[in-house]
From Swiss-Prot:
Species the sequence originates in: Trichophyton rubrum
Domain of life: Eukaryota
Gene: ND4
Catalyzed reaction equations: a ubiquinone + NADH + 5 H(+)(in) = a ubiquinol + NAD(+) + 4 H(+)(out)
Protein name as annotated: NADH-ubiquinone oxidoreductase chain 4
PANTHER family (alphabetical): NADH-UBIQUINONE OXIDOREDUCTASE CHAIN 4
Origin organism lineage: Eukaryota, Fungi, Dikarya, Ascomycota, Pezizomycotina
Amino acid sequence: MFFQNIMIYLFSLLLIPLIVYFLLIYIRLRYSNNSNNQIKTIGLTTLIINLILSMIIFILFDFSSKQFQLQLEEIYKISYFDLYLGIDGISIYFLLLTTMIMPISLVANWNSIDSKNVLSFVIIILLLETLLLAVFLVLDILLFYIFFESILPPLFLLIGLFGSSDKVRASFYLFLYTLLGSLFMLLSIITMSSIMGATAFDALSKANFSYITQLFLFYGIFISFAVKTPTIFLNTWLLKAHVESPLAGSVILAGIVWKLRWYGIFRLIIPLLPKASMDYTYIVYVIGVITIFYTSFSTLRTIAIKELIAYSSVSHAAVYLLSAFSNTIQGIEGAIALGLAHGFVSSGLFICVGGILYDRSSTRLITYYRGMAQLMPIFCILFLYITLGNCGSPLTLNFIGEFMSLYGIFERISVLGVLASTSIVFSAAYTIFMFNRIAFGGQFSSYFFNYVKDLSKREFILLISLVVPAVFFGIYPAVILDGLHYSVSGLIYN
């Protein structure tokens, strides 16, 4: 009976944080004094419970099937649709990534949130996890859009309340750019619903839209995802959002939120619009290659470390975008592996720069750093592992993801595959430069003093929890690739 009801775990992933929301309000009202540690502990415990639940779901999941599993149907009927939940061999990995990154984001800001705003911060984190998980769990395209856009208000508040000096402008940039871009996707969803009379993924996957209809739907959905990924000419909001965001915001943005757009490609474009996605791949590839070159050159010239990491993330996102449209098993599996690796590595880089180093120096300019290996040797060792992961070095999951992604791109359009492979050279150039300047570069800067401490226990746990999966899955990628094979095959050949 226990195993027959495991689909309840999916609903529990969404319900538990909402229950804790009211519990936290009660604690604040009942224990008004000295309850901040209790609030943070309860929030962290909730996130860890969700992580354990997602691991149980992963263990019980049947990877030999390409169908949605553990489906929980008709939880609640809402006027035009029912709430359907389910997972497949693709969404389960993003589910795990979300439940791993969210507790890390909370612990990353454990000591840096003003005592008056701890309750608001924890509630926003819990609400974000609920909405993020809902995007990966729902089996309805309209619900996908609703939860997809519902993430914007909590992110707006997270940056607007807890960000840096220009936080208000950054939060409005993020909100307005991404919201306006989503209008194109909403129009596409309304069109599909009016044609088919249904919004469930299963029903829409059986649709045979005309070529002209597919073309308009493709451009509508792709423009929305291109704004949110972001790609060239549509990335104005990116630097503001990352630079002004609190550490937790940067970790969530790069580690999870970007994956929603990539995941949407596998749900809305490739299976529902196969002809348009095949015929107009070259447009996506040209945009992706231009994005790689633009962001790589921008990264090479910046002196702000947080901007460097943000541009680096866009460059890797462009490789992911190209491989997602490769229409090959190797390319799509590589894209998903690269997305997971990017979640670990980009989160680690932001914690190293926006958290550990910034807490000790109050600056993010690379010109102030050198010789940190003399002061913080343990930090520099873990920082090195994360840096090598960002370069796509062997024995890291990034290497597996980038190699398979570039192979898929080359199989699809060889010339653009060769151009896309320059991302490896560029990423090595700016990432190794960043590490060399921070860790070595001679005697440590007079900007720092001899009493600068190495990693605390909290910081060490944060970094090691990101380094271990990135290295483990790089050495043994079969855990991911074997599980993806059936679902990716069904995505391409159905």
